[in-house]
Amino acid sequence: MTRLVILDNEAVQALRDPAHPKHRLVISHAQVIVSRKRRAAAIELVVPTAVRVEAGWDRASSAWVLPNRLRIADIPLDTANASTAAAIRNQTGVSVADAHLGAVIQSALADQITVITSDPGDMRLVAGDRKVTVAAI
């Protein structure tokens, strides 16, 4: 079974800032993922690049050292994801970042998808017909 864990904007911001009120909660999710990877579980932690931009995550900046160490993979807004995201945005009116996140959910090959988010309603909306686990922060 393959698992995909996707971060939304607030989860990314909380990872960076130890003073963020949700920092501990997001760190605890990240620790679970790291421990499962150590046990050779097929799990990947990702961030859509539009979410990364919205959060201000510059991988070259020393301010983002902790998220950079977690080996969170970028999911680019390529042609296919852009078309899906545009359709999601047109249907729902969500932000570009949330639409990109929805495109990642809808195109994922993983058996199980989890989204760490501060907006569970929007994540269920952009997921379309895909079953997702929403970890609300």
Where are these regions (language model features)?
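Acidic catalytic patch
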Residues: 51, 71-92
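Alpha-helix capping/helix-boundary segments
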Residues: 11, 51, 81, 100-101, ...
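Acidic, metal-associated active-site segment
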Residues: 95-114, 122
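Short, hydrophobic beta-strand segments that form beta-sheet elements in well-ordered domains
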Residues: 47, 55, 114-117
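Acidic, PIN/NYN-like endoribonuclease modules and their adjacent C-terminal/linker elements
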Residues: 2-4, 110-137
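Short, conserved active-site loop motifs that form the nucleotide-linked donor/cofactor pocket
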Residues: 43, 71-73, 113, 132
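Short, well-structured N-terminal submotif of metal-dependent ribonuclease cores
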Residues: 1-45, 56-70
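Phosphate- and divalent-cation-binding pockets in alpha/beta enzyme and binding domains
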Residues: 54, 84, 125-126
